[in-house]
Amino acid sequence: MKRGMMFVLGAVLLLAGLALLFGRPFIAEQAFRRALDTNVGVDQSAAFADGLHLYVCGSGSPMPDADRAGPSLAVLAGNQAFIFDSGSGSIRKLGRMGFPMGKLRGEFLTHLHSDHIDGLGESLLQAWIAGGRSSPLPVYGPEGTDKVVAAFNAAYQIDSTYRVAHHGPKVANPTGFGGAAQIIALPDGADSQVIYDQEGVKITAIRVIHDPVKPAFGYRIDYKGRSIAISGDTVYAPAFVAASKGVDLMLHDALNKDMVAALGAKLAERGQPRTAQIMHDIQGYHASPEDAARAGKDAGAGTLVLYHLVPPVPARLIEPLFLGQAPKVFPGTLKLAQDGMIVHLPAGSKAVEFASGL
């Protein structure tokens, strides 16, 4: 009896193994079909409530980071979408998050450091093709933005001719290629100015402190009673705090000086003086987590999210070390940005809801 049971059990296991082995192509195809139905061509934002929605597609810095792309954020306000900086790798993550490129109205550069613009070419390309543009994308930024945009347009010009020839003008309308620079020049003595005001969306450029990079800007976005402030790269900047009063959500850059100093010391010890010098220099023009927490507190921000994280924070175990005393300084919700994070601020509400878009 026992032998019979063992034989039956063995036969069942053998058949199950054979089914699994030879059924793999079928299972794989079904999984592929489900992924097509769920993700491809689906505007994930169509299910969002009216309001402001922040996409974190790049929470990292120039330092190599397997988990975080270069600095980039995107905002959806009703039917209008905007990108703030385009760090390396960020635009591909934004695509994975289902960002509605067809609603993109413009890109806003905080400043012209390479890590904030090295993905601009890809951003303009996606705006043109995926967004179906018939005119160049407006790119707002400080003095010099015209040179940067012209250079990216030139670099991608040959590629654009291939795409028009291959896909035709209905897919790649030649008049929609590239970017059109819009220079932000604040009046003398002014620390902030509204630079975009359309269909209920107001975007304010704010002077921040990132010397020797001048000018450098943060931005505030207002829509239907909800608000987001984005610092860009800066130390604690009183003008940014003043212009961010009462925001629902503040995004602020953060650099842990003790950790960066330790990196610099190790680099010097290992005979890399140039990189060690950079680790010393960058401490003077970024906010510490405590500085960012103070900015959020002084502005009365409801929620504070730290991004442009220096150095990389590869595991949650390290987050308390990176944050230092910041949680004691900022009285509200405080988080480290993660690529793929989406923050929902529904209109007519005080809610701040976190979700994952990856």
Feature-to-residue mapping (PLM):
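Cap/insert and terminal regions of metallo-dependent hydrolase folds
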Residues: K2-G17, F217-G218, K224-A229, V235-D339
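Binuclear metal-dependent hydrolase catalytic cores
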Residues: K2-I228, R316-E353
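Residue-level structural signal for beta-strand termini and adjacent loop
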Residues: G87, D233-T234
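Short, solvent-exposed mixed-charge patches
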Residues: G357-L358
